Amino acid sequence: MKIDLSRLVTESRNPASAEIDTLSTVEMLRVINQEDQKVALAVEAVLPHIAQAVDAITHAFAHGGRLIYMGAGTSGRLGILDASECPPTYGTPAELVVGLIAGGHTAILKAVENAEDNRELAQNDLKSLNLTANDVVVGIAASGRTPYVLGGLEYATLIGATTVSIACNPVCPMADAAQIAILPVVGPEVVTGSSRMKAGTAQKLVLNMLTSGAMIRSGKVFGNLMVDVEATNAKLIQRQTNIVVEATGVCAEEAEEALKACDRHCKTAILMILSGLDAEQAKTKLQQHNGFIRAALNDK
């Protein structure tokens, strides 16, 4: 079946770059940069829809659910990138935020032919994760019409999971296939059809907001400090110390002493210093308040 892509914004020609092959290198880059500046504004226009998705993901996390990204090509890789950053940044289990890409692991590094056109493949991928109604499935595709993503959203709807779509065309099948549609319209690409450019940047900004927003809402940020960060390397060990110093105002030595007393758990160390509790008391208090430092501090 022939697919008419000409009506898609993401496939149309951009008059601003029509002669880009004749420009100097600096002029060429200036055109790209000027077009990139439109991306943040396109994302700003859909903030209310992003907020709906953040609240849905936060609710899912609080009720044993997961966040599952689905995409093909660049969109799938962006989902995997965002998912992979959550454990080291927020101390989450690897299975809490998952990225699926059409074609599996091979497709992360190189294209897998016809994988994105297979709806059944998406259903099988979700079945392998034992998808439940508590989960949130986020379909990502610049065009808004990728069969793999549509198949995943359809199966997720059947199971009763919350569905979200992220696309860069204002009218597309994915908008109708999800409960929450996030559609940052960034306009035609500098290189016609190269949706890894503005569309990919918009998708990355939205994904940043989804996970960051949900983690903040889940108590994993205190002030603007990532208080669930795990000490998996030398840089993060030092970051833990800096976080405790910033959160409490104590010196680095006192912060390090508190961290050592609680197996390097930032939240516990912060609560110990600010409340005068010992490590076990602080851990218990945090558990009583689902890991929210502010709530634990306010419980006198």
Swiss-Prot record:
Its EC number is 4.2.1.126. It is an enzyme of class 4 (lyase). Pathway: Amino-sugar metabolism; 1,6-anhydro-N-acetylmuramate degradation; Amino-sugar metabolism; N-acetylmuramate degradation; Cell wall biogenesis; peptidoglycan recycling. SUPFAM superfamilies: SIS domain. The keyword Lyase applies. InterPro entries: Etherase_MurQ, Glucokinase_regulatory_CS, MURQ/GCKR, SIS_dom, SIS_dom_sf. It catalyses: N-acetyl-D-muramate 6-phosphate + H2O = N-acetyl-D-glucosamine 6-phosphate + (R)-lactate. The keyword Cytoplasm does not apply. Keywords: Carbohydrate metabolism, Lyase. A lyase-type mechanism (elimination/hydration) is suggested for the cleavage of the lactyl ether bond of MurNAc 6-phosphate, with the formation of an alpha,beta-unsaturated aldehyde intermediate with (E)-stereochemistry, followed by the syn addition of water to give product. Homodimer. Belongs to the GCKR-like family. MurNAc-6-P etherase subfamily. Specifically catalyzes the cleavage of the D-lactyl ether substituent of MurNAc 6-phosphate, producing GlcNAc 6-phosphate and D-lactate. Together with AnmK, is also required for the utilization of anhydro-N-acetylmuramic acid (anhMurNAc) either imported from the medium or derived from its own cell wall murein, and thus plays a role in cell wall recycling. PANTHER family: GLUCOKINASE REGULATORY PROTEIN. This is N-acetylmuramic acid 6-phosphate etherase. It comes from Vibrio vulnificus (strain YJ016). The gene is murQ.
